């Protein structure tokens, strides 16, 4: 069985990206793992501020209501993922991870055969397509990464980006095995 992982921002689930992944998963005969990443980097990073000429360190601490809202949104995203998997007749597995997204995804890329990510994925609200976060993920990932289209009809062609690095060569070889 192949380990195919689709990456989602736990706070912004996109059901449109799942149609593309469902097609890939059905073709490969495996299940889809939905990795829901909760960005906690803004919570733990203290920041230096100044008031009336005096410096002080400010740390963001979430209230229990804010934490509950984040958890509720994540739970709703996971439920929508599982429901969409049922609609597409594929087996879905949901995993929620908290932390710094770039570190989580680099680590996860070591243990999966393929990652599927929306080119719009961003944890800071960036609107460029693809986002800087996705560019960095493409460079750092240790497995093939497929960018899902906004609207999926069927796969007509596959375009492979190759920068000459060893990791890109390995990713192309892994993709060919899929």
Model segments located where?
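Small/aliphatic-rich secondary-structure junction motif
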Residues: 1-60, 140-143, 153-178
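Gly/Ser-rich helix-loop-strand patches that form or flank binding pockets
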Residues: 3, 14-20, 25-26, 94, ...
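Conserved phosphate-coordination/catalytic loops
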Residues: 12, 72-75, 96-99, 128, ...
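Structural beta-alpha unit
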Residues: 39-42, 65-68, 72-115
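Short, well-ordered alpha-helical scaffold segments within catalytic/effector domains
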Residues: 78, 102, 131, 169-172
